Amino acid sequence: MANRLKEKYLNEVVPALTEQFNYSSVMAVPKVDKIVLNMGVGEAVSNAKSLEKAAEELALISGQKPLITKAKKSIAGFRLREGVAIGAKVTLRGERMYEFLDKLVSVSLPRVRDFHGVPTKSFDGRGNYTLGVKEQLIFPEINFDDVDKTRGLDIVIVTTANTDEESRALLTGLGMPFAK
């Protein structure tokens, strides 16, 4: 069974975008390429347990094992040495990517307090969208009682669109609630 967001993309979004931007081929229509979830855990320098907990939560949210990221260079001001584990990231593609995006749009974002839509200024000029989440509690997989500390995470939605306008039309079609 195909994911409902993928079906919506194929049946509704592709024809709408083809009409709006006059694409000559269905293959020219932009699509979501991958979603990268990143959780930077600065306190992992002094407390290794916090990184384990963050990675565990990221695995619950994404449904796949996160990659532990390490510091590229030493920064004395942050008491950071090169090669020390300071974060975790997950790259979602295919079915898991559509499942996560569907869950993000329909369940998680509406749970954000005082939510008026995601900002429209977070496109990078190449058709990719970046979204910061202040707390991991908005995701239904995270049990409120098991959380030791609220942590934020970055969500990067990478699309094959060439412009921000095309990317915004794609994400709007997929149900992303942009602020008016």
Swiss-Prot record:
Q: How does it assemble?
A: Part of the 50S ribosomal subunit; part of the 5S rRNA/L5/L18/L25 subcomplex. Contacts the 5S rRNA and the P site tRNA. Forms a bridge to the 30S subunit in the 70S ribosome.
Task: Tell me what organism the protein belongs to.
Answer: Streptococcus pneumoniae serotype 2 (strain D39 / NCTC 7466)
Identify the coding gene. rplE
Which UniProt keywords are listed? Ribonucleoprotein, Ribosomal protein, RNA-binding, rRNA-binding, tRNA-binding
For this record, an example GO cellular component is: ribosome
Q: Specify the domain of life of the species encoding this protein.
A: Bacteria
Q: Which InterPro entries match?
A: Ribosomal_uL5, Ribosomal_uL5_bac-type, Ribosomal_uL5_C, Ribosomal_uL5_CS, Ribosomal_uL5_dom_sf, Ribosomal_uL5_N
What's the protein here called? Answer: Large ribosomal subunit protein uL5
Role, per record: This is one of the proteins that bind and probably mediate the attachment of the 5S RNA into the large ribosomal subunit, where it forms part of the central protuberance. In the 70S ribosome it contacts protein S13 of the 30S subunit (bridge B1b), connecting the 2 subunits; this bridge is implicated in subunit movement. Contacts the P site tRNA; the 5S rRNA and some of its associated proteins might help stabilize positioning of ribosome-bound tRNAs.
| Family membership noted in the UniProt record | Belongs to the universal ribosomal protein uL5 family.
